[in-house]
């Protein structure tokens, strides 16, 4: 997790950094609403209630009246590649709308709290130790690590963040790097992405520890969580 955060990696690993000066000057908390494609399968199949992005923005503003609400619409919707169900302009009076091509890791580092329906960015926010509110049932909700608005009674394990990360990012997937798709450990995959994104200074690469402390891992809890992840429909 420390490598992912230190190297600024995220879901897409593209876009420009989000310096705070690009956001309105403020000493208030910043709460990010992650816009999604509203007819995406992750929402249709992963959320019992039907929320639009604008619904989430309004809920966020109501629950955080003293905070600065920042809304990032999904880039595929902004680009006209996917259908728009709710118009960001309808909530422009209660939030700051980011429509540029911003780097997601930099954006997460710039906020204190993230609201989402099912986006993977919610888990990336957890990795960066941000508070996360979830309205659907993505793989990382229901374990006691997020503010959940949808019950997930089958998820009975209570893993730590380290344990959930181990289950979801180390034990569950297989990693391939290079044009030949060579099998790799997660550390090699992270370094490959970091180098591909913008190069990694040697001193930073050598100064970041990739290992999870052994005392932070409960093997039984990780195994139970991993079984829970395997049962989630893809």
Regions picked out by a protein language model, each given a short descriptive name:
Residues 1-26, 144-234:
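Leloir-type glycosyltransferase catalytic cores
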Residues 28-40, 73-74, 137:
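Short loop/turn segments at strand-loop or loop-helix junctions that form parts
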Residues 35, 67-73, 217-220:
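Functional cation/ligand-contacting sites centered on basic and imidazole/sulfhydryl donors
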Residues 41-56:
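Mid-to-C-terminal functional-domain signal that highlights helix-capping/loop sites
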Residues 53-58, 84-87, 93, 103-113, ...:
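C-terminal structured domains
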Residues 57-100:
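Catalytic donor nucleotide-activated moiety binding site of glycosyltransferases and closely related
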Residues 101-146:
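A donor-sugar binding/catalytic signature common to diverse glycosyltransferases
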């Amino acid at each position: 997790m420390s490598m992912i955060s230190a190297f600024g990696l995220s879901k897409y690993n593209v876009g420009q950094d989000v310096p705070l000066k690009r956001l309105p000057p403020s000493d208030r908390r910043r709460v990010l609403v992650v816009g999604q494609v509203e007819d995406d399968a992750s929402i249709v199949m992963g959320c019992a209630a039907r929320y639009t992005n604008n619904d989430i923005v309004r809920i966020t503003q109501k629950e955080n009246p003293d905070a600065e609400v920042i809304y990032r619409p999904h880039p595929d919707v902004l680009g006209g590649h996917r259908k728009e169900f709710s118009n960001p302009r309808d909530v422009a009076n209660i939030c700051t709308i980011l429509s540029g091509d911003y780097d997601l890791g930099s954006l997460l580092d710039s906020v204190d709290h993230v609201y989402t329906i099912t986006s993977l960015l919610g888990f990336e926010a957890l990795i960066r130790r941000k508070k996360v509110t979830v309205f659907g049932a993505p793989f990382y909700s229901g374990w006691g690590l997020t503010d959940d608005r949808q019950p997930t009674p089958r998820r009975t394990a209570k893993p730590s963040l380290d344990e959930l990360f181990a289950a979801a990012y180390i034990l569950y997937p297989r990693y391939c790097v290079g044009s030949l798709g060579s099998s790799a450990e997660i550390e090699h995959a992270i370094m490959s992405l970091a180098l591909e994104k913008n190069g990694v200074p040697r001193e930073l690469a050598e100064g970041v520890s990739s290992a999870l402390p052994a005392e932070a891992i409960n093997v039984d809890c990780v195994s139970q969580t991993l079984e829970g992840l395997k049962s989630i429909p893809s």
